[in-house]
Amino acid sequence: MLTMDDIVREGHPALREVATEVTFPLSDEEKKLGHDMLEFLINSQDEELAEKYGLRGGVGIAAPQLAVTKRFLAIHVHDEKDRLYSYVLYNPKIRSHSVQQACLSGGEGCLSVDREVPGYVVRSERVTIDAFDENGTPLKLRFKGYPAIVVQHEIDHLNGVMFYDHINKENPSYLPPDVDVFG
């Protein structure tokens, strides 16, 4: 079972590397890590387990956050209609994105960042993702709103990008016109 001790923090070189694609068939270790990542997210959203094991609540995690510079991630997040998006995605790529932008009202956080970083992180409101499941089956997934923000945050990790790299350095509270704000 993964715990917060397994997650590397900002400053670790794995968080700034561009991760390499996995090849199929996946190794047993890659499959297990994908399962463990999803289990961590589910456990972190369970109040009792989170308290028992000292887990910070998370909705997404990428392999580089575990010092594994390979292109896979897990998300476990509900949208505003309470639809669950629970996936382990291997070699995910953004196929297309909306012109309409969105952000979270309180900014973003990260399991690898132990401090609050104020500022808006503006992202695409909708994305279409091409990825593979653990068996190498191709997936085409559409995300909108909060789940879209989460999956973009995790794909950034695969490219060595941290959420705060997107914040306006001169004016963190600047919000471009016509950005939809969630939360």
Curated annotation (Swiss-Prot):
One of its GO terms (biological process) is translation. It catalyses: N-terminal N-formyl-L-methionyl-[peptide] + H2O = N-terminal L-methionyl-[peptide] + formate. Binds 1 Fe(2+) ion. Keywords: Hydrolase, Iron, Metal-binding, Protein biosynthesis. It is an enzyme of class 3 (hydrolase). The active site is at 154. Signal peptide: none annotated. The keyword Iron applies. It comes from the Bacteria. Fe cation binds at residues 110, 153, 157. GO terms for molecular function: metal ion binding; peptide deformylase activity. Its cofactor is Fe(2+). The keyword Hydrolase applies. Its EC number is 3.5.1.88. Pfam families: Pep_deformylase. Removes the formyl group from the N-terminal Met of newly synthesized proteins. Requires at least a dipeptide for an efficient rate of reaction. N-terminal L-methionine is a prerequisite for activity but the enzyme has broad specificity at other positions. Belongs to the polypeptide deformylase family. This is Peptide deformylase. The lineage of its organism: Bacteria, Bacillati, Bacillota, Bacilli, Bacillales.
